[in-house]
């Protein structure tokens, strides 16, 4: 088992930052959690892993209030790309604006995967 895989128990911020920075991909994927809407949280708990296809609402930032489907997830950078959230480039083209999952709220879950349903119901 790799040294980084063990969760850090220290309360020192520098060690927490170092853990997140040096974490391997399979551990980083656990950081891509977002809060669930009120009706979903009653059934599935407070948070859930964001996956492509989920419908989310942006809660903070310039795009606050925008609702759209998750188009892409960048596990390495811990960012989520949402349809309808973009920024204009200098040449006039629209480019997707990645958002940190802590600024999102999941409003509709994709429940096609039986393993995901089982993990949500365990909570």
UniProtKB/Swiss-Prot annotation:
Part of the 50S ribosomal subunit. GO terms for cellular component: large ribosomal subunit. The keyword Ribonucleoprotein applies. PROSITE patterns: RIBOSOMAL_L24. The keyword DNA damage does not apply. It comes from the Archaea. Keywords: Ribonucleoprotein, Ribosomal protein, RNA-binding, rRNA-binding. CDD domains: KOW_RPL26 (cd06089). GO terms for biological process: translation. It comes from Methanocella arvoryzae (strain DSM 22066 / NBRC 105507 / MRE50). Belongs to the universal ribosomal protein uL24 family. One of two assembly initiator proteins, it binds directly to the 5'-end of the 23S rRNA, where it nucleates assembly of the 50S subunit. InterPro entries: KOW, Rib_uL2_dom2, Ribosomal_uL24_CS, Ribosomal_uL24_euk/arc, Ribosomal_uL24_KOW, Translation_prot_SH3-like_sf. It holds the Pfam family Ribosomal_L26. One of its GO terms (molecular function) is rRNA binding. This is Large ribosomal subunit protein uL24.
